Design a protein with these regions (language model features):
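N-terminal entrance/gating region of PLP-dependent enzymes' catalytic architecture
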Residues: 36-116
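Conserved internal helical-beta-strand scaffold that buttresses enzyme catalytic cores
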Residues: 97, 109-111, 115-118, 122-129, ...
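Conserved C-terminal alpha-helix-loop-beta "cap" of PLP-dependent enzymes
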Residues: 350-445
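Conserved PLP-enzyme active-site core in the AAT-like
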Residues: 2, 139-308, 389, 396-405, ...
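Gly-rich Lys/Arg/Thr-decorated short loops/hinges at beta-loop-alpha junctions or inter-strand turns
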Residues: 92-104, 122-127, 152-153, 175-183, ...
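Short loop-beta-helix segment that forms the pyridoxal 5′-phosphate
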Residues: 102-106, 123-142
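Compact, charge-rich alpha-helical regulatory domains located at protein termini
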Residues: 1-34, 39
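Active-site C-terminal subdomain of aminotransferase-like
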Residues: 268-380
Length: 456
């Protein structure tokens, strides 16, 4: 395809068509203080590639990188060790096929790995079936809500207070364009989940109850109790898993009554990636497969009787009129799904359980040590690799001070819930296998120094 640059007349016609006078009008939403004025500081107007690289490296050293500091951030995105073999294998030629595997004859590598990925997710979630992935955990959560509405023919979804606020926000944004009614709220700083409070919101209009497992505070809700109550009122239970490594140790949601299980697959194979791309996981009961969004890869045989893989049941999604489709999502996070599948394969079932046990033991060590810091209260007794501590002052300021001292010490609830003053002192701490006992000790001693007002 030829590249034909625009002429001044072309630009003028395009601006007139959208009602803009000049190019700068397209950037009015960017705050004035964020726009570049004049030359880039430290660089001349013309600079060589080497000079620009040197300048960028110098700027990057001002950042506190995840690999260079004790790292206890979580709340939906987790730092795990990803074996080098994952990045090596995803670059193999078998997977470097065209974007969409519509021609199975030339995309067997991609299709087979997606088939295996679906199998891994279904086994992990305890569901009958899983799709070939969605964009990320939050959009998968919304897709589960509207899927439940189609199945039950109801439009009220109860979002448990422990559901990640970003997932709630995504659902609220999408619900502006549908008839779905969402009930949600902020969590309380209680040690245990209040399942009875969730159940009290279920009525005959409820399509589904959405429960994070473990929740945003690290607590582990009683899914079976909520599932039984939801089913009694003709509603479905949607379980949301933001940390899939937890399922190496705790019971799969599908085994506890969840009808639809969704989640974020970033923890396995993908990495933090500055917040994306990530990987939406989606599983459900087989009887709901026709209402499930996204792609499905199936196993078949070719004309010679050899095993092969194809996209199947496509008529429920992209090969159909828009108003009849199950979703507006007609793609999947294929590369991230491949990385997830390779990492899972390298671990195996026993490896995943071992990894989960290491995470849990490190979290227990951290909770014990942080609980010894004067003024700190560990909120929850039951958790996987993430728990909440309550500080004597605003956690946002404490986190800022910790970062200045070289420790990335958790996610403040005040950042996640800026309008909830009662949560301001809460700090969510995630502890994975990358957190060494030395890191935990550094975190505890630094936190103690910050709270006692000691100079850095």
């Amino acid at each position: 395809m030829r590249y034909l640059p625009l002429t001044d007349d072309n630009r003028r016609e395009m601006l007139e068509a959208i009602g803009a006078r000049e190019i700068d009008d397209l950037f009015v939403d960017v705050p004035a203080e964020a726009r570049l004025k004049g030359d880039i500081e430290g660089l001349p107007k013309q600079a060589s590639e080497m000079a620009v690289e040197k300048h960028m490296r110098r700027l990057s050293k001002k950042n506190l990188a995840a690999n260079d500091a004790p790292f206890f951030l979580g709340a939906g995105a987790y730092r795990h060790h990803v074996p080098a073999s994952v990045d090596h294998l995803i670059q193999r030629g078998e997977f470097l096929t065209a974007y969409t595997p519509y021609q199975p004859e030339i995309a067997q590598g991609t299709l087979q790995v997606l088939f295996e990925f679906q199998t891994q997710v279904a086994r992990m979630f305890g569901t009958d079936i899983a799709n070939a992935s969605l964009y990320d955990g939050s959009t998968a959560c919304w897709e589960a809500i509207v899927m439940a509405g189609r199945i039950t023919r109801k439009s009220r979804a109860v979002l448990a207070h422990g559901l990640h606020p970003h997932y709630v926000s995504t659902a609220q944004t999408m619900a502006k364009f549908t008839k779905d009614e969402l009930f949600s709220g902020a969590p309380d700083l209680d040690a245990d989940c209040d399942e009875d409070a969730i159940i009290a919101q279920i009525d005959d209009r409820t399509s589904c109850v959405v429960v994070q497992y473990p929740d945003i505070l690290g607590r582990i809700p009683d899914l079976q109790k909520i599932a039984d109550a939801a089913h009694d009122r003709g509603a479905l239970l949607v379980a949301v898993v933001t940390e899939p490594v937890a399922l190496g140790l705790i019971e799969a949601p599908g085994a506890l009554g969840a009808d639809i299980v969704v989640g974020e697959g970033q923890s396995l194979g993908v990495g933090l990636n500055f917040g994306g791309p990530y990987l939406g996981l989606f599983g459900c009961r087989e009887k709901f497969v026709r209402q499930m969004p996204g792609r499905l890869c199936g196993e078949t045989v070719d004309a010679d009787g050899k095993r092969g893989f194809v996209l199947t049941l496509s008529t429920r999604e992209q090969h159909i009129r828009r108003e009849k489709a199950t979703s507006n999502i007609c793609t999947n996070s294929g590369l991230c799904a491949l990385a997830f599948s390779i990492h899972m394969t390298l671990l195996g079932g026993a490896g995943l359980e071992k990894l989960a046990r290491i995470n849990h033991s490190r979290a227990r060590l951290a909770a014990q040590r942080l609980g010894e810091v004067k003024g700190v209260r560990v909120l929850n007794d039951a958790y996987f690799n993430e728990f909440t501590i309550v500080l004597p002052s605003d956690a946002r300021e404490v986190v800022r001070e910790l970062a200045e001292r070289g420790v990335l010490g958790g996610v403040s609830l005040g950042r996640l819930y800026p309008d909830e003053e009662a949560l301001a002192n809460g700090l969510v701490v995630a502890v994975t296998e990358t957190c060494t006992p030395e890191d935990i000790e550094t975190f505890a001693t630094t936190l103690s120094a910050v709270l006692e007002g000691e100079a850095a």
